[in-house]
């Protein structure tokens, strides 16, 4: 490891001592990155409460208040000191601790198993990119479902030159566990990266409890066979489940203590979970069997270093606003109201499809039970052509996935009283195409 910064070398030694698998999963960049213990942010933090603080590039008034513009500050209901200065690269500590507590509360199967304290990133996209920086080499393939968020192409393939290998998401209207197992075991034992996104974008599918057990079993068996597994869990739509028998916990709760050869990384955020899309606050959290506080602290430091070298930090104003909001007395009720509204739209889509069997001649819905979206697969016409007809002739916008001949419909963003018309327009457009 000649040429590495001594701080990176020390972090690597700690990681290798506590988890050889985690060390072997790190990319070259992941091994080289470090949190500058004596860098500008660290030195400014050390001087924070001193009488004279001439460290960081932030302007302050003579009385110590941030030197802000009142025309901007007047729009905010929080103190200027909680909005205008820089946040730490790892995120503000009260928010990180709160999110960790929420992960534990929402995923009780974690029990007392030790996990890392989440590191704040600027949205899930940035979180995934940071994970790519730390763990993905240009020789790596990432195993994921054939129905996937198109931004993975930019995040992992364009940025890190990783290959994408797909398993079939569905077989007989259920999760295709056989295809998943085949793809996991296709290559000889070694480093393998798996990316799982539930509720799935674009399909809106979350595995059942039984399917979740089988997915975990496949991964545990692969780890037992000598594979070093990095399992990335994109939990962007976590919590939006609308059916019984469907997993209500993240797979992270099963995988964080699954095997010493499996490092689980949960990437989630307030974007969808907390209805704060433009705040750009997300989290990266680590879990591995027998993970120690020392291991997790080192991974947090490397992650913070990756954030520092990429975006410096996530906005303080967003972190502070959310932290204040989530601690309010009305937060939980407001969140339940929003989920109930999206659930009504979900059930309306189900009713419309059940009431119109004639639609099946032209399109059928992929399995869906959660999230923001559902997809229809066209049977007789081109998705591109139908998309164009809908847009130009029927003032209806959906997302087209031409390579799969799918249309994605965001019921979460569509008024309930417009959903029946949406599918009627789709039916007519398919007949015209």
Q: Model-derived features: where do they sit?
A:
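Short beta-strand
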Residues: 51-53, 88, 267, 363-369, ...
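Conserved core of the PLP fold type I
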Residues: 79-231, 238-259, 417-419, 424-427
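Short, solvent-exposed loop/turn segments at secondary-structure junctions
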Residues: 57-61, 125, 149-150, 199-202, ...
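Conserved core segment of the aminotransferase class I/II
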Residues: 4-18, 102, 256-340
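Conserved glycine-rich beta-strand-loop-beta hairpin in the small C-terminal domain of fold type I
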Residues: 316, 335-350, 362-377, 402-405
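N-terminal small-domain helix-loop-helix segment of the aminotransferase-like
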Residues: 3-10, 28-122, 433
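Short hydrophobic/aromatic beta-strand micro-patches
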Residues: 285, 375-377, 410-412
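PLP-dependent enzyme catalytic core of the Aspartate aminotransferase-like
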Residues: 2-3, 93, 101, 105-112, ...
């Amino acid at each position: 490891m000649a040429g590495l910064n001594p701080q990176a070398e020390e972090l690597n030694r700690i990681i290798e001592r506590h988890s050889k698998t985690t060390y072997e999963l790190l990319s070259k960049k992941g091994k080289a990155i470090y949190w500058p213990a004596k860098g500008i942010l660290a030195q400014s933090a050390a001087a924070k409460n001193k009488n004279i603080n001439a460290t960081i590039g932030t302007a302050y008034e003579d009385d110590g208040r941030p030197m802000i513009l009142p025309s901007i500050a007047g729009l905010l209901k929080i103190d200027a000191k909680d909005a205008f200065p820089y946040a730490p690269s790892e995120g503000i500590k009260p928010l990180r601790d709160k999110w960790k507590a929420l992960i534990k509360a929402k995923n009780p199967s974690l029990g007392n198993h030790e996990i890392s304290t989440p590191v704040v990133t600027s949205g899930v996209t940035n979180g995934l990119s940071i994970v790519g920086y730390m763990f993905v080499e240009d020789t790596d393939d990432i195993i994921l479902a054939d129905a996937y968020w198109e931004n993975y192409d930019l995040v992992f393939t364009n940025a890190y030159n990783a290959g994408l290998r797909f398993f079939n998401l569905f077989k007989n209207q259920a999760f295709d566990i056989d295809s998943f197992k085949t793809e996991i075991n296709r290559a000889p034992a070694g480093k393998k990266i798996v990316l799982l996104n539930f509720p799935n974008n674009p399909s809106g599918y979350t595995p059942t409890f039984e399917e979740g057990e089988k997915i975990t079993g496949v991964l545990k068996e692969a780890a037992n066979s000598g594979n070093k597994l990095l399992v990335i869990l994109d939990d962007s739509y976590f919590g939006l489940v609308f059916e019984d028998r469907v997993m209500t916990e993240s797979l992270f709760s099963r995988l964080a203590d699954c095997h010493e050869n499996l490092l689980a990384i949960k990437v989630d955020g307030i974007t969808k979970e907390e209805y704060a899309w433009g705040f750009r606050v997300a989290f990266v959290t680590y879990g591995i069997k027998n993970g120690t506080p020392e291991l997790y602290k080192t991974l947090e430091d490397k992650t913070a270093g990756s954030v520092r070298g990429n975006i410096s930090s996530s906005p303080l104003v967003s972190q502070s606003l959310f932290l204040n909001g989530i601690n309010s007395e009305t937060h939980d009720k407001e969140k339940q109201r929003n989920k109930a509204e999206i659930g009504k739209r979900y059930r309306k889509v189900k009713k419309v499809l059940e009431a119109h069997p004639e639609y099946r001649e032209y399109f059928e819905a992929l399995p869906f039970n959660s999230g923001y979206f559902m997809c229809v697969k066209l049977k007789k016409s081109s998705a591109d052509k139908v998309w164009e007809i809908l847009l130009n002739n029927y003032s209806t916008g959906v997302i087209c996935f031409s390579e799969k001949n799918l249309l994605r419909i965001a019921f979460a963003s569509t008024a309930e009283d417009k959903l029946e018309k949406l599918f009627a327009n789709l039916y007519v457009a398919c007949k015209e195409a």
